[in-house]
Amino acid sequence: MPADGIPEGIPAEDLLRASIEVALAAVREPLVLAVSGGSDSMALLFAMERWAPDRIAAVATFDHGTGSYATDAASLVAAHGRRLGLTVIRERARRPGVNEAAWRDARWSFLQRVARGFHARVATAHTRDDQAETVVMRLLRGSGARGLAALAAPSPVVRPWLGVSREELTRWLASEGLPFLEDPMNASRYFLRARVRHELLPACEAASPGFRDAMLLIGERAARWRREVEQYLDQAGLVVEHAGRSASLPVEVLEQTTPEGQAVLWAALSARAGVTLDAHGTRAAVRFTSSRRRGAYITVAGGAAIMRTRRAAEQVASDVGADRGIRAPAGVGERFVVRSRAAASEAVEWSGESTTLPRRLGQWRFRRLAAAPAAFDAWHMGLPAGTSVVVRPWREGDRIRSAGAAAGRRVTRYFTESRIPVPDRSQWPVVLVDDEVAWVPGVCRGLAAPSRSGRSELIWYRCEREFD
């Protein structure tokens, strides 16, 4: 099965160049090339440098720390990447993973960090053979249509070689005299993918010629179905925030469909937030759909949170996107939200003087005011001039002295009274003045800052929460 729009039987060089052109046609961002040192990824490195060098932001290579091969492969990538004049980012695992899943998680965490740093997308060297193997592996574990799309599923990851075979890439490298290393673990029958590659697929192909192409066709049909689901989400008022770590839909979209449809939509919505729902999580999400209590939430696999919340009508109308011609739906503001645990881990900390609070800290903005506001609430605070200030995420055990609790009260109680959803709290900013909690924006203000004697001048700020 050739790549989309590319005829069969063309020379290898023309095939590779055309595959890159097709894959990059709809991609605006620069690319971080994921290169391991094997034949597929080294072909990606050399081909991209030859035919699309201006699209390369960096070359990323990850040493899993599993032995001499991993180090040699990373060194090969780094040497040739730099020889070609490309930026190379190399990292070694702090501790070797214990299985394929751990290696994959560590590698993807690294690639995503590098891509964010360059405001780029990741490009991998997955081939047509990888797609066939992945479809078979998904069948073996009982995946539904969503999982059977495998590597062809809609994704921010760019995969130029998905219509190219591993053999074609190796043959091109040999004809050009280009180097690569063969990973000895690819031949090990210890790993499921290797057993599928070397034993199961050849046996099935021998018993039923065309089996491999049939698997590819299943994957393509499933991918087409997934693209239709994704288009439906976009048209139904999807909002993606926090650098892709949070996604939401109007509650009516899910409430007005069948439980079977809800299962499909919850899985797709979760994926937009970087969350993979397992069967248990999908069932829990479907049950949660009938929840009518705003602020209710559940946690699912990986520590991700699903919640029901309300947002201001003007914010929803803006986020849904007037540029797409989508009107905010009836009952505006009530939304189901999926938020990955990673969204909380991206909260950042700042320290400095009270006169120079950061204009922006993550999704929070601090705006300095020229004078004390005529009317103010917990979103406003006056900080004494010349004091040391720290802005950091809330921590379990934080306490604040207030007019109603001069001895101090746990911030978590104020969160509860202000109806701040539990999943939101780990990202919520806390402002400390001289090491004492003085302000939790939008929630409460303390006595710590203004009540100290000899501090007449106050620097006034308003904190605003932004939505990406």
Curated annotation (Swiss-Prot):
It catalyses: cytidine(34) in tRNA(Ile2) + L-lysine + ATP = lysidine(34) in tRNA(Ile2) + AMP + diphosphate + H(+). It comes from the Bacteria. Belongs to the tRNA(Ile)-lysidine synthase family. One of its GO terms (biological process) is tRNA modification. One of its GO terms (cellular component) is cytoplasm. It is found in: Cytoplasm. PANTHER family: TRNA(ILE)-LYSIDINE SYNTHASE-RELATED (PTHR43033:SF1). The N-terminal region contains the highly conserved SGGXDS motif, predicted to be a P-loop motif involved in ATP binding. The keyword Aminoacyl-tRNA synthetase does not apply. It holds the Pfam family ATP_bind_3. InterPro entries: Lysidine-tRNA-synth_C (IPR012796), Rossmann-like_a/b/a_fold (IPR014729), TilS/TtcA_N (IPR011063), tRNA_Ile_lys_synt (IPR012094), tRNA_Ile_lys_synt_N (IPR012795). Signal peptide: none annotated. It comes from Gemmatimonas aurantiaca (strain DSM 14586 / JCM 11422 / NBRC 100505 / T-27). Keywords: ATP-binding, Cytoplasm, Ligase, Nucleotide-binding, tRNA processing. This is tRNA(Ile)-lysidine synthase. ATP binds at residues 36-41. Its EC number is 6.3.4.19.
